[in-house]
Amino acid sequence: FDFILIEGAGGIAVPIYEGTDDFYMTKDLINDCADCVISVLPSKLGAISDAIVHQDYVNQNVSASNFLIMNRYTDSYIEKDNQMTIGKLTNKTVYTFEEHATYENFSEAFLKQLIGVKNELHTTT
């Protein structure tokens, strides 16, 4: 990747700048320059609702593809159930990232998905 933008401003539906007539939102920045989005989800109670609302917003407003990853995953029964349920409801693979893990702990499957990701919107011919 030439550039990596890490969003930490409170979510994908957050205004970055208020113009005269409208807002420039995080989704606008993503649409302007992102090839893919890694959507970081909670793994605890409430994760299903957060994931469904987030993914619905992404599907309606973002042109880049996205990956779902549950953060601070401890492999508890609730987290396993959340992962399975979110996957079924979004029709997406839900990757996990363990609590206190480092970049070396990303799964091979997740890293393979990232390699070569290209958003057709930003590809010129």
Task: Please place each PLM-identified region on the residue numbering.
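Switch II (G3) loop of P-loop NTPases
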Residues: 1-21
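Conserved acidic residues
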Residues: 2-3, 34-35, 66
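Structural motif
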Residues: 5-7, 38-40, 69
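Anionic group-transfer/hydrolysis microenvironments
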Residues: 9-10, 44, 73
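Secondary-structure boundary/capping motif
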Residues: 14, 46-50, 78
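Inter-motif core of Ras-like GTPase G domains
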Residues: 19-43
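Histidine-anchored nucleotide/phosphate-binding helix
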Residues: 23-30, 49-59
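C-terminal lobe/tail of nucleotide-utilizing enzymes
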Residues: 52, 56-125
